[in-house]
Protein backbone atom coordinates (compact mmCIF):
# COMPACT_ATOMS: atom_id res chain seq x y z
CA UNK A 1 0.00 0.00 0.00
CA UNK A 2 1.37 3.43 -0.95
CA UNK A 3 2.04 5.82 1.91
CA UNK A 4 1.19 9.52 1.95
CA UNK A 5 3.85 12.16 1.20
CA UNK A 6 4.32 13.13 4.86
CA UNK A 7 5.01 9.52 5.84
CA UNK A 8 7.52 9.23 3.02
CA UNK A 9 9.29 12.34 4.28
CA UNK A 10 9.39 10.94 7.82
CA UNK A 11 10.93 7.71 6.51
CA UNK A 12 13.67 9.68 4.77
CA UNK A 13 14.36 11.74 7.89
CA UNK A 14 14.64 8.58 9.99
CA UNK A 15 17.18 7.19 7.53
CA UNK A 16 19.27 10.39 7.40
CA UNK A 17 21.47 9.84 10.51
CA UNK A 18 22.24 6.29 9.39
CA UNK A 19 23.19 7.46 5.91
CA UNK A 20 25.44 10.10 7.46
CA UNK A 21 26.98 7.56 9.84
CA UNK A 22 27.77 4.99 7.13
CA UNK A 23 28.71 7.35 4.29
CA UNK A 24 32.07 6.31 2.87
CA UNK A 25 32.11 3.12 4.98
CA UNK A 26 32.45 -0.37 3.54
CA UNK A 27 29.61 -2.84 4.11
CA UNK A 28 30.14 -6.43 2.97
CA UNK A 29 26.91 -8.20 2.04
CA UNK A 30 26.65 -11.94 1.51
CA UNK A 31 23.71 -13.01 -0.63
CA UNK A 32 23.00 -16.53 -1.76
CA UNK A 33 21.21 -19.81 -1.41
CA UNK A 34 17.45 -19.92 -1.07
CA UNK A 35 17.27 -16.14 -0.63
CA UNK A 36 18.29 -15.74 -4.30
CA UNK A 37 15.75 -18.12 -5.82
CA UNK A 38 12.93 -15.67 -6.59
CA UNK A 39 13.87 -13.43 -9.51
CA UNK A 40 11.73 -10.45 -8.50
CA UNK A 41 13.04 -10.50 -4.94
CA UNK A 42 16.61 -10.81 -6.20
CA UNK A 43 16.17 -7.74 -8.39
CA UNK A 44 14.70 -5.86 -5.43
CA UNK A 45 17.65 -6.69 -3.18
CA UNK A 46 20.08 -5.52 -5.83
CA UNK A 47 18.15 -2.26 -6.27
CA UNK A 48 18.49 -1.72 -2.53
CA UNK A 49 22.25 -2.27 -2.83
CA UNK A 50 22.37 0.30 -5.64
CA UNK A 51 20.49 2.70 -3.36
CA UNK A 52 23.15 2.26 -0.67
CA UNK A 53 25.86 3.03 -3.21
CA UNK A 54 23.99 6.12 -4.44
CA UNK A 55 23.89 7.64 -0.92
CA UNK A 56 27.63 7.21 -0.44
CA UNK A 57 27.86 3.83 1.28
CA UNK A 58 30.37 1.38 -0.22
CA UNK A 59 28.70 -2.04 -0.60
CA UNK A 60 30.66 -5.16 -1.52
CA UNK A 61 28.55 -8.15 -2.56
CA UNK A 62 29.69 -11.75 -2.04
CA UNK A 63 27.33 -14.35 -3.48
CA UNK A 64 26.71 -18.05 -3.45
CA UNK A 65 24.35 -19.98 -5.71
CA UNK A 66 23.69 -23.43 -4.32
CA UNK A 67 20.23 -23.97 -5.89
CA UNK A 68 21.56 -22.93 -9.31
CA UNK A 69 24.49 -25.34 -8.95
CA UNK A 70 22.12 -28.16 -8.01
CA UNK A 71 19.98 -27.41 -11.05
CA UNK A 72 22.93 -27.60 -13.44
CA UNK A 73 24.33 -30.75 -11.87
CA UNK A 74 20.94 -32.38 -12.43
CA UNK A 75 20.83 -31.19 -16.05
CA UNK A 76 24.28 -32.69 -16.63
CA UNK A 77 23.38 -35.94 -14.81
CA UNK A 78 26.14 -35.42 -12.25
CA UNK A 79 25.14 -36.85 -8.86
CA UNK A 80 25.73 -34.67 -5.81
CA UNK A 81 25.58 -35.03 -2.06
CA UNK A 82 26.45 -33.17 1.10
CA UNK A 83 28.53 -34.17 4.13
CA UNK A 84 28.12 -32.10 7.31
CA UNK A 85 26.39 -29.43 5.24
CA UNK A 86 29.29 -29.21 2.75
CA UNK A 87 28.89 -30.02 -0.93
CA UNK A 88 31.06 -33.00 -1.88
CA UNK A 89 33.09 -31.49 -4.74
CA UNK A 90 34.96 -33.84 -7.06
CA UNK A 91 36.68 -32.59 -10.23
CA UNK A 92 33.53 -32.74 -12.37
CA UNK A 93 31.46 -30.97 -9.73
CA UNK A 94 34.12 -28.30 -9.25
CA UNK A 95 34.03 -27.55 -12.96
CA UNK A 96 30.27 -27.02 -12.80
CA UNK A 97 30.51 -24.95 -9.60
CA UNK A 98 33.00 -22.59 -11.23
CA UNK A 99 30.98 -22.40 -14.45
CA UNK A 100 27.75 -21.58 -12.62
CA UNK A 101 29.05 -19.20 -9.95
CA UNK A 102 31.63 -17.32 -12.01
CA UNK A 103 30.16 -17.51 -15.50
CA UNK A 104 26.42 -17.38 -14.85
CA UNK A 105 25.26 -16.20 -11.42
CA UNK A 106 27.96 -13.55 -11.06
CA UNK A 107 27.21 -12.02 -14.45
CA UNK A 108 23.46 -12.09 -13.85
CA UNK A 109 23.96 -10.10 -10.65
CA UNK A 110 26.21 -7.58 -12.39
CA UNK A 111 23.60 -7.14 -15.13
CA UNK A 112 20.76 -6.62 -12.63
CA UNK A 113 22.80 -3.99 -10.80
CA UNK A 114 23.38 -2.25 -14.12
CA UNK A 115 19.66 -2.35 -14.93
CA UNK A 116 18.98 -0.77 -11.53
CA UNK A 117 21.25 2.15 -12.40
CA UNK A 118 24.37 1.01 -10.60
CA UNK A 119 27.82 0.09 -11.83
CA UNK A 120 29.30 -3.25 -10.82
CA UNK A 121 32.34 -5.38 -11.62
CA UNK A 122 32.15 -9.17 -11.34
CA UNK A 123 35.06 -11.05 -9.78
CA UNK A 124 36.01 -14.40 -8.34
CA UNK A 125 38.79 -15.23 -5.91
CA UNK A 126 41.19 -15.96 -8.78
CA UNK A 127 41.02 -12.38 -10.11
CA UNK A 128 43.84 -10.09 -9.04
CA UNK A 129 45.00 -12.72 -6.54
CA UNK A 130 42.04 -11.62 -4.46
CA UNK A 131 41.63 -14.87 -2.50
CA UNK A 132 44.15 -17.65 -2.01
CA UNK A 133 42.49 -20.93 -1.11
CA UNK A 134 43.68 -24.06 0.64
CA UNK A 135 42.15 -27.48 1.08
CA UNK A 136 40.18 -28.27 4.21
CA UNK A 137 42.16 -31.49 4.32
CA UNK A 138 39.14 -33.78 4.20
CA UNK A 139 39.39 -36.25 1.34
CA UNK A 140 35.71 -37.17 1.56
CA UNK A 141 34.57 -33.67 0.52
CA UNK A 142 37.04 -33.14 -2.33
CA UNK A 143 37.78 -29.63 -3.55
CA UNK A 144 36.05 -27.77 -0.73
CA UNK A 145 38.44 -25.11 0.45
CA UNK A 146 38.93 -22.45 3.04
CA UNK A 147 40.46 -18.99 2.88
CA UNK A 148 44.24 -19.00 3.18
CA UNK A 149 44.73 -15.28 2.54
CA UNK A 150 43.02 -12.25 1.04
CA UNK A 151 44.56 -9.40 -0.94
CA UNK A 152 41.89 -6.66 -0.85
CA UNK A 153 43.73 -4.16 -3.07
CA UNK A 154 41.63 -4.83 -6.18
CA UNK A 155 38.38 -4.48 -4.24
CA UNK A 156 39.60 -1.25 -2.63
CA UNK A 157 40.50 0.16 -6.04
CA UNK A 158 37.04 -0.66 -7.40
CA UNK A 159 35.35 0.94 -4.39
CA UNK A 160 37.41 4.10 -4.79
CA UNK A 161 36.27 4.20 -8.42
CA UNK A 162 32.60 4.07 -7.42
CA UNK A 163 32.08 0.45 -8.50
CA UNK A 164 30.16 -2.25 -6.65
CA UNK A 165 32.39 -5.35 -6.47
CA UNK A 166 30.42 -8.58 -6.97
CA UNK A 167 32.47 -11.58 -5.84
CA UNK A 168 31.85 -15.31 -6.26
CA UNK A 169 33.37 -17.65 -3.71
CA UNK A 170 35.58 -19.68 -6.09
CA UNK A 171 39.34 -19.37 -5.50
CA UNK A 172 42.53 -21.29 -6.24
CA UNK A 173 45.54 -22.48 -4.27
CA UNK A 174 49.19 -21.78 -5.11
CA UNK A 175 49.16 -24.51 -7.79
CA UNK A 176 46.08 -23.11 -9.55
CA UNK A 177 43.70 -25.80 -8.29
CA UNK A 178 40.22 -24.34 -7.92
CA UNK A 179 38.24 -24.72 -4.69
CA UNK A 180 34.65 -24.13 -3.72
CA UNK A 181 34.63 -21.99 -0.56
CA UNK A 182 31.63 -21.25 1.64
CA UNK A 183 30.38 -17.78 0.68
CA UNK A 184 29.68 -16.83 4.30
CA UNK A 185 33.32 -17.53 5.12
CA UNK A 186 34.56 -15.49 2.17
CA UNK A 187 32.33 -12.56 3.14
CA UNK A 188 33.51 -12.61 6.75
CA UNK A 189 37.20 -12.78 5.88
CA UNK A 190 36.83 -10.10 3.21
CA UNK A 191 34.99 -7.81 5.64
CA UNK A 192 37.86 -8.16 8.10
CA UNK A 193 40.54 -7.51 5.48
CA UNK A 194 38.72 -4.39 4.23
CA UNK A 195 38.15 -3.02 7.74
CA UNK A 196 34.43 -3.03 7.01
CA UNK A 197 31.89 -1.22 9.13
CA UNK A 198 29.46 -4.12 8.83
CA UNK A 199 29.06 -7.69 7.64
CA UNK A 200 25.54 -8.53 6.47
CA UNK A 201 24.42 -12.13 5.90
CA UNK A 202 21.21 -12.29 3.87
CA UNK A 203 19.67 -15.70 4.54
CA UNK A 204 16.28 -17.38 4.32
CA UNK A 205 15.47 -16.91 8.04
CA UNK A 206 14.57 -13.72 9.98
CA UNK A 207 17.79 -13.97 12.00
CA UNK A 208 18.73 -15.88 15.15
CA UNK A 209 15.62 -17.31 16.81
CA UNK A 210 15.33 -18.63 20.36
CA UNK A 211 12.76 -21.05 18.96
CA UNK A 212 13.32 -21.99 15.28
CA UNK A 213 9.59 -22.70 14.95
CA UNK A 214 8.58 -19.25 16.24
CA UNK A 215 9.51 -16.24 14.07
CA UNK A 216 8.46 -13.93 16.90
CA UNK A 217 11.34 -15.26 19.05
CA UNK A 218 13.87 -13.23 17.06
CA UNK A 219 16.92 -12.11 19.05
CA UNK A 220 17.57 -8.56 17.87
CA UNK A 221 20.91 -7.87 19.62
CA UNK A 222 23.63 -10.04 21.13
CA UNK A 223 27.35 -9.95 21.69
CA UNK A 224 30.08 -12.47 20.93
CA UNK A 225 29.95 -14.12 24.36
CA UNK A 226 26.18 -14.58 24.23
CA UNK A 227 26.40 -15.92 20.67
CA UNK A 228 28.92 -18.56 21.77
CA UNK A 229 26.65 -19.54 24.66
CA UNK A 230 23.70 -19.94 22.31
CA UNK A 231 25.76 -22.35 20.20
CA UNK A 232 26.86 -24.32 23.27
CA UNK A 233 23.31 -24.60 24.61
CA UNK A 234 21.86 -25.66 21.25
CA UNK A 235 19.70 -22.57 20.69
CA UNK A 236 21.80 -21.90 17.60
CA UNK A 237 22.05 -25.14 15.66
CA UNK A 238 22.21 -26.69 12.22
CA UNK A 239 23.04 -24.39 9.34
CA UNK A 240 22.93 -21.32 11.55
CA UNK A 241 26.06 -22.42 13.46
CA UNK A 242 28.59 -21.65 10.68
CA UNK A 243 26.87 -18.34 9.98
CA UNK A 244 27.14 -17.24 13.60
CA UNK A 245 30.73 -18.50 13.80
CA UNK A 246 31.53 -16.49 10.67
CA UNK A 247 30.11 -13.36 12.33
CA UNK A 248 32.04 -14.01 15.54
CA UNK A 249 35.30 -14.37 13.64
CA UNK A 250 34.69 -11.17 11.66
CA UNK A 251 33.92 -9.22 14.83
CA UNK A 252 37.03 -10.59 16.52
CA UNK A 253 39.06 -9.25 13.58
CA UNK A 254 37.74 -5.71 13.85
CA UNK A 255 34.45 -5.57 11.95
CA UNK A 256 32.24 -3.27 14.03
CA UNK A 257 28.95 -5.18 13.67
CA UNK A 258 27.46 -8.19 11.91
CA UNK A 259 23.84 -8.74 10.95
CA UNK A 260 21.84 -11.83 10.00
CA UNK A 261 18.49 -11.23 8.32
CA UNK A 262 15.99 -12.59 5.83
CA UNK A 263 17.05 -11.70 2.30
CA UNK A 264 13.66 -12.78 1.00
CA UNK A 265 11.74 -10.22 3.06
CA UNK A 266 10.94 -7.01 1.15
CA UNK A 267 13.64 -4.35 1.58
CA UNK A 268 15.05 -6.09 4.66
CA UNK A 269 18.53 -4.75 3.94
CA UNK A 270 17.40 -1.11 4.01
CA UNK A 271 15.15 -1.68 7.01
CA UNK A 272 17.99 -3.26 8.97
CA UNK A 273 20.57 -0.61 8.14
CA UNK A 274 18.57 2.60 7.94
CA UNK A 275 15.79 2.36 10.55
CA UNK A 276 15.77 2.53 14.34
CA UNK A 277 14.11 -0.85 14.90
CA UNK A 278 15.81 -3.01 12.27
CA UNK A 279 14.40 -6.36 11.21
CA UNK A 280 17.13 -8.95 11.91
CA UNK A 281 19.76 -9.97 14.44
CA UNK A 282 22.69 -7.67 15.15
CA UNK A 283 25.89 -9.12 16.63
CA UNK A 284 28.45 -6.85 18.28
CA UNK A 285 31.84 -7.23 19.97
CA UNK A 286 31.50 -7.95 23.67
CA UNK A 287 33.36 -4.86 24.82
CA UNK A 288 30.71 -2.65 23.22
CA UNK A 289 27.63 -4.57 24.35
CA UNK A 290 26.94 -2.83 27.65
CA UNK A 291 27.43 0.60 26.14
CA UNK A 292 25.19 -0.08 23.16
CA UNK A 293 22.38 -1.56 25.23
CA UNK A 294 22.27 1.65 27.27
CA UNK A 295 21.82 3.74 24.14
CA UNK A 296 18.16 3.69 23.28
CA UNK A 297 18.87 5.65 20.11
CA UNK A 298 22.06 3.84 19.11
CA UNK A 299 22.78 3.12 15.47
CA UNK A 300 21.81 -0.26 14.06
Curated annotation (Swiss-Prot):
Binding locations of substrate? 65-66, 87, 180
GO cellular component entries = cytoplasm
Q: Where is this site: Transition state stabilizer?
A: 30, 243
**Looking at the Swiss-Prot or TrEMBL record, what is one Pfam family this protein matches?**
AA_kinase
Q: What is its main location?
A: cytoplasm
Might you give the EC number(s) for this enzyme? Answer: 2.7.2.8
Q: Which InterPro entries match?
A: AceGlu_kinase-like_sf, AcgluKinase_fam, ArgB, Asp/Glu/Uridylate_kinase, Glu/AcGlu_kinase, NAGK-C
Instruction: Look up the domain of life of the source.
Output: Bacteria
Q: Which SUPFAM superfamilies match?
A: Carbamate kinase-like (SSF53633)
Record keywords: ATP-binding included?
yes
Associated pathway: Amino-acid biosynthesis; L-arginine biosynthesis; N(2)-acetyl-L-ornithine from L-glutamate: step 2/4
Annotated localization:
Cytoplasm
Q: What does this protein do?
A: Catalyzes the ATP-dependent phosphorylation of N-acetyl-L-glutamate.
Q: Which family does it belong to?
A: Belongs to the acetylglutamate kinase family. ArgB subfamily.
Please give the name of this protein: Acetylglutamate kinase
**Annotated organism of origin:** Synechococcus sp. (strain JA-3-3Ab) (Cyanobacteria bacterium Yellowstone A-Prime)
Its gene is argB
